[in-house]
């Protein structure tokens, strides 16, 4: 983990002296300068730890023995954690700036009243490609199966993302529980093997920027960072459908510094901070006041702030339950 900031005294919800906040977040998913700023403004030191999958984060919190005050799970994982009583119900009277969150990002199926979560970032899963290394611009998932891309495709390390684009290519739902559909998607995915160069995490950014692969299946924010570093890269969301995801701030029941957790949520809801974070990370912000502060070159880019028409073809992951999640992972 990493420590940012300086020490100071703060009163915790129990009245004991506290100067600490423990955050559990995805890697490379906040501007470090904001953590420094938070500490300078509040005197609260941040202990920052990272995870690389929702499943890893969920398992660690579920097993107990941790003291995370803030975590950043995705949509379907929030639903699961709420049902398993792993999250604190938020006191809205302690939250300032929630009204700045766009209506499209509130009241979603995984937390219908936002009783447990505050929108942080949102985005899509799509195809990043190198214009100098592809003969034809990929527009559809089926394009990945072209023999032109033998040993030229990087896949994000996520079972639902990888199986998901195979399901989408066949016209099936990302949340299907139909075993026939899943087996057909598995068979089709297996036929992609000759084209797969590697299944990777954050390392994909370096490989794509360096031109080590022609195509990558990844998240929109990761693609944004790649595009900033290599002018030959482009990003597309296939028109037949893909994943629309949401990552939210939550307070796990492992919380030891609840007052500090609310202070952090309010800090991140400030438009100037949310805008700075969005520009640094490259993901789309649900904070409309923050979006207004961003350059139009960012907010007008339909690859990263897609149109309503595109969004209608996208699906949010449902919480499949342990049995079906296991089946997806096994495939």
Labelled PLM ranges:
Residues 67, 72-212:
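Extracytoplasmic ligand-binding site segments that recognize negatively charged/polar headgroups
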Residues 123, 182-191, 229-253:
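Periplasmic-binding protein-like
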């Amino acid at each position: 983990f990493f420590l940012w900031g300086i020490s100071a005294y703060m009163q915790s919800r129990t009245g004991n002296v506290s100067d600490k906040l423990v955050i559990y977040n995805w890697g490379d998913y906040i501007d470090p300068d904001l953590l420094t700023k938070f500490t300078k403004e509040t005197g609260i030191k941040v202990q920052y730890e990272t995870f690389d999958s929702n499943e890893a984060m969920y398992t660690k919190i579920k097993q107990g023995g941790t003291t995370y005050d803030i975590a950043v799970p995705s949509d379907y994982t929030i639903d699961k954690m709420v049902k398993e009583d792993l999250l604190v119900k938020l006191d809205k009277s302690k939250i300032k700036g929630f009204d700045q969150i766009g209506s499209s990002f509130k009241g979603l199926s995984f937390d219908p009243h936002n009783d447990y979560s505050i929108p942080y970032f949102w985005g899509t899963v799509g195809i990043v490609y190198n214009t100098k290394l592809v003969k034809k611009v990929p527009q559809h998932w089926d394009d990945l199966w072209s023999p032109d891309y033998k040993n030229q495709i990087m896949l994000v390390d996520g079972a639902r993302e990888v199986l998901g684009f195979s399901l989408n290519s066949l016209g099936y739902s990302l949340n299907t529980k139909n075993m026939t559909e899943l087996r057909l998607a598995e068979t089709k995915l297996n036929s992609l093997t000759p084209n797969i160069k590697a299944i990777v995490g954050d390392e994909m950014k370096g490989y794509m920027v360096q031109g080590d692969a022609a195509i990558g299946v990844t998240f929109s924010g990761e693609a944004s960072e790649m595009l900033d570093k290599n002018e030959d890269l482009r990003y597309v969301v296939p028109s037949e459908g893909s994943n629309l995801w949401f990552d939210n701030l939550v307070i796990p029941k492992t919380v030891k510094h609840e007052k500090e957790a609310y202070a952090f949520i309010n800090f991140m809801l400030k438009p100037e901070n949310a805008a700075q974070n969005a520009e640094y990370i490259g993901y789309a912000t649900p904070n409309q006041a923050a979006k207004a502060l961003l350059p139009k070159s960012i907010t007008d880019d339909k690859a990263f702030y897609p149109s309503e028409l595109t969004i209608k073809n996208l699906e949010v992951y449902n919480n499949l339950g342990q049995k079906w999640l296991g089946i997806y992972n096994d495939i």
